[in-house]
């Protein structure tokens, strides 16, 4: 009988290692929650906690004091519920598809109602059950994505019976430009939100996303729901596409700590002659004798094809440029600057870490950190750690 493939063996076989620092996640939550108190701070853990594993990440936020958790779909909420304690509340940002209302109510999950149709369906279930059902009510204040329009809101206020069947916990909206402090759209959305709330006296409200928590107290209201900032991205810094050196030396303004070192394993090192072509299409041509290394990750692992002949990895302080096209399962690096024998089969190189942050990789991909983070995939060995005072202990 063959022995089972152990977790240690799986990790060794993986093309790279994604390390998730739970202590940094807790720090980021606490830093935001402390700064905006007494406003309650929720955690957005949709898309499997931005790709980092909601079943591990959400409990870390809970330990830091979080009791309100937002996901996008009902299925995400149902899957996460067993990993949280009974006093935690789960909210579904996209609301409910027809026919799922009873399951949502049965599970004790709160939907965000984004349209009159969703309101009517939720109220109809409340009538059948003979009790008011809790929910959040979202208004569109300028993003034109989700939420009741001004006309729908007028119609809703005219239907007293409909409103009486729902226990509205929060009126919410979403900032379209919260990560741009100087954008006038923020003030316009705030004004619209304030006007809406004047027609719903004493109703708690939520407007601030990650960027909104840095715009000032007038945006905080009763509940904030940061997302990307919890995962180590300064919302103001993520759009900085300035010179790389200036970008790397820029200090985060908001005590947000990076949470995910990412490394990849070398699978081959070789010497090539002048004129050798590298990768699909031969888009890189060696301009002299050089040493190259191939690492075992590619665009299937969230390292997008747009990094071809553009991005880099690091070994120690040495930058190793990506040469040739990024393949599905591999990337080739120019390692000529390293002494011969430095890299060998199984050596690890840094893709995200102290030498280049997630924002830097996103910039090289011409995208945003959200897209990289949620695309990292499940082929990495995932290691959850707590880092305290320079010491690291791996969790089970």
Curated annotation (Swiss-Prot):
Pathway: Amino-acid biosynthesis; D-alanine biosynthesis; D-alanine from L-alanine: step 1/1. Substrate binds at residues 145, 328. SUPFAM superfamilies: Alanine racemase C-terminal domain-like (SSF50621), PLP-binding barrel (SSF51419). It catalyses: L-alanine = D-alanine. Disulfide bonds: none annotated. One of its GO terms (biological process) is D-alanine biosynthetic process. The keyword Isomerase applies. Its cofactor is pyridoxal 5'-phosphate. Catalyzes the interconversion of L-alanine and D-alanine. May also act on other amino acids. NCBIfam families: alr (TIGR00492). This is Alanine racemase. It comes from Brucella ovis (strain ATCC 25840 / 63/290 / NCTC 10512).
